[in-house]
Amino acid sequence: MPMENDNGPHVGNVVVTAEQATKINETDGRLPENRQTGVVSDTGSGSERGEQGVGESAVAVAVPVEESGSISVGELPAPRSSSARVPFTNLSQIDADLALARTLQEQERAYMMLTMNSEISDYGSWETGSYVYDEDEFDDPENEDEDDDEDEYETDDDPQEDGLDVNVHANEDDQEDDGNSDIEEVAYTDDEAYARALQEAEERDMAARLSALSGLANRVVEDLEDESHTSQDAWDEMDPDELSYEELLALGDIVGTESRGLSADTIASLPSKRYKEGDNQNGTNESCVICRLDYEDDEDLILLPCKHSYHSECINNWLKINKVCPVCSAEVSTSTSGQS
């Protein structure tokens, strides 16, 4: 749009790029029109302006144009920062840092405003009690109409049901209060009666618990009896010959040991003799096999039916456990001992 200056001539703004300005400056001297009008191109100044101002990108440049339409003589005017928009990549380091800082500050300010607005809205909803969980928010939109219809029918019955529930709970509370009040009245009249009432109540509770536990105990006893029968059957079916050494030891611990020795009377009825040094007749040894000690002269020994002699104390303890001879394993029977 043409503008009027103070000097008089009208000047217009023409947008040209750096390359176009360079070409214009190079070709202005060659055009016959410029030769007639006396226009001289300044190629060096135009190229310097293009390199310093914008580089390779396009920049809007205001060029004064006279009414005749020809470009005035002289250098191109410098671009104004207010009307020019330079890309971020073409800025210097300081300008780029400043632009980035401003952008981050604007983003932070916008984020703070959004946060403050959300907190204010949350505070308002908390004051109004809008934090109640609403299941309708997560339901399907198709079921909203059906839910609304059901709510309309249910709203009429809810007050009555709530009233009945309140009455039931109130009656129960009244009964409990009456029972407690009776006990408290007794407590006010006589402490001993109050203590007895409490003791009777505890006894009734304990009896109820014991009756419940007795039923469980009976079931446990029945289960144990069944298990004992099954375990006895398992022992009856077990063959000791097929057991391992560890199983035999465990069986011995469970069953116990059976005494296979002689009675004290039978042991006392065994014959005795006096040892004579150098007397080795009838299988008499010079030492006791049980204690490994030599016999002394004129020492009393116990003589078994198999003609093996031992110290009386040693053989007595042995025969209490086992009724066989330690040397030949011959059984020491009652009849044999009586005959000898």
Curated annotation (Swiss-Prot):
Q: Where is the composition biased (Acidic residues)?
A: 133-164, 173-182
MF terms (GO), sorted A to Z? ubiquitin-protein transferase activity; zinc ion binding
Q: What class of enzyme is it?
A: transferase
Q: Which pathway is it part of?
A: Protein modification; protein ubiquitination
Against Gene3D superfamilies, the record matches this protein to: Zinc/RING finger domain, C3HC4 (zinc finger)
Start and end residues, zinc fingers (RING-type): 288-329
Q: Where do the segments described as Disordered lie?
A: 1-56, 133-182
Q: Where is the composition biased (Polar residues)?
A: 34-46
Q: Which domain of life is it from?
A: Eukaryota
Q: Its catalytic activity?
A: S-ubiquitinyl-[E2 ubiquitin-conjugating enzyme]-L-cysteine + [acceptor protein]-L-lysine = [E2 ubiquitin-conjugating enzyme]-L-cysteine + N(6)-ubiquitinyl-[acceptor protein]-L-lysine
tRNA processing among keywords? no
Q: Name one GO biological process term.
A: protein ubiquitination
> In what way is this protein post-translationally modified?
Auto-ubiquitinated.
Keyword annotations: Metal-binding, Transferase, Ubl conjugation, Ubl conjugation pathway, Zinc, Zinc-finger
Question: What Pfam families is this protein classified in?
Answer: zf-RING_2 (PF13639)
User: What this chain does, per the record?
Assistant: E3 ubiquitin-ligase probably involved in organ size regulation.
- The name under which this protein is listed is E3 ubiquitin ligase BIG BROTHER-related
**Gene source species:** Arabidopsis thaliana (Mouse-ear cress)
